């Protein structure tokens, strides 16, 4: 689930091993139209390439490797072909990255806060998702969702988002699966031991929701997607709560944890 596929050109230059930058949910089913009200679809000139999460009426959180020139965000989307009446489109007014992010490491502190050019309104298909209030426990049931590829090798992007349940695993499982990643990365490890269910190309920036709380952002994984014993890695949102809250409050110079 090497999430680094979303920004393929950029990441290929920096991370020859990163293959899952923008992955889709493999092994899932079509999401209920009302279960992804905070899910944001991100498009550029080539089409859909990443997801994000609506935190409030003005801010979206996604992966920093989802940054692209002239992208747009669509909120309230289910089918990419059929417009919802309450669907809203916004452009980025401001993009904020961790100021202490390592410039030579595209995967370090892989978060991007995007301020919308105008606020969105809550509606039948639009509602923000709060930051987590407590960290998740190993064994927690977690929900993944996105418009990413639904096939593990050949990229097959669906018209509607797919959802699936996976479990939060011990960090040691992912450390063993991905020894190339620095130990200081603040991540969560999630998947199913037998494989077959995973985020995949195009799912980057989307959420990992554990027991109803927004705990992770799709970050990194194996290619092909869904292979055992290589679960997905997700940026650990709660470790960045203070930074996110500070930026939203107006302190755009706030520093992320090391």
Swiss-Prot record:
SUPFAM superfamilies: Trypsin-like serine proteases. It is found in: Secreted. Residues 1-18 form the signal peptide. Its EC number is 3.4.21.-. Keywords: Disulfide bond, Fibrinogenolytic toxin, Fibrinolytic toxin, Glycoprotein, Hemostasis impairing toxin, Hydrolase, Protease, Secreted, Serine protease, Signal, Toxin, Zymogen. It comes from the Eukaryota. N-glycosylated. Contains approximately 10% carbohydrates. PROSITE patterns: TRYPSIN_DOM, TRYPSIN_HIS, TRYPSIN_SER. One of its GO terms (molecular function) is toxin activity. Residues 19-24 form a propeptide. The active site is at residues 65, 110, 204. Glycans are attached at residue 44. GO terms for biological process: proteolysis. InterPro entries: Peptidase_S1_PA, Peptidase_S1_PA_chymotrypsin, Peptidase_S1A, Trypsin_dom, TRYPSIN_HIS, TRYPSIN_SER. Coiled coil: none annotated. Optimum pH is 7.5. Its main location: secreted. Optimum temperature is 50 degrees Celsius. Snake venom serine protease that shows non-specific action on fibrinogen. It preferentially degrades fibrinogen Aalpha (FGA), releasing fibrinopeptide A, and shows a lower activity on fibrinogen Bbeta (FGB), releasing fibrinopeptide B and other uncommon fibrinopeptides. Also shows low fibrinolytic activity compared to plasmin. Has high enzymatic activity on the substrates for activated protein C and factor XIa, and for thrombin. Shows a wide activity spectrum at different peptide sequences, with a preferential cleavage at Lys-|-Xaa over Arg-|-Xaa bonds. Monomer. Belongs to the peptidase S1 family. Snake venom subfamily. This is Snake venom serine protease HS114. It comes from Bothrops jararaca.
């Amino acid at each position: 689930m090497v999430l680094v596929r979303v920004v393929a050109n950029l990441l290929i230059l920096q991370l020859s091993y990163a293959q899952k930058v923008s992955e889709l949910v493999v092994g899932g089913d079509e999401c209920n139209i009302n279960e992804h009200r905070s899910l944001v679809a991100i498009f550029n000139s080539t089409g859909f390439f990443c997801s994000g999460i609506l935190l409030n009426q003005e801010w979206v959180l996604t992966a920093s490797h989802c940054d692209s020139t002239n992208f747009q965000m669509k909120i309230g989307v289910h089918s990419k072909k059929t417009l919802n009446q309450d669907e809203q489109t916004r452009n980025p007014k401001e993009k904020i990255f961790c100021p202490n992010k390592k410039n030579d490491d595209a995967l370090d502190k892989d978060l991007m806060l995007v301020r919308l050019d105008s606020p969105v309104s809550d509606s039948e298909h639009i509602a923000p998702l709060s930051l987590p209030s407590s960290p998740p426990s190993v064994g927690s049931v977690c929900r993944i969702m996105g418009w990413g590829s639904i096939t593990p090798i050949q990229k097959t992007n669906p018209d509607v988002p797919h959802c699936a349940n996976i479990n939060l695993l011990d960090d040691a499982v992912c450390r063993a699966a991905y020894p190339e990643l620095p130990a200081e990365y603040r991540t969560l490890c999630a998947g199913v031991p037998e494989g077959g269910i995973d985020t995949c190309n195009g799912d980057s920036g989307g959420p990992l929701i554990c027991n109803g709380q927004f705990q992770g952002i799709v970050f990194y994984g194996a290619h092909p997607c869904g292979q055992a014993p290589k679960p997905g890695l997700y940026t650990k949102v709660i470790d960045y709560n203070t930074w996110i809250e500070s930026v939203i409050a107006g302190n755009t110079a706030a520093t992320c944890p090391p």
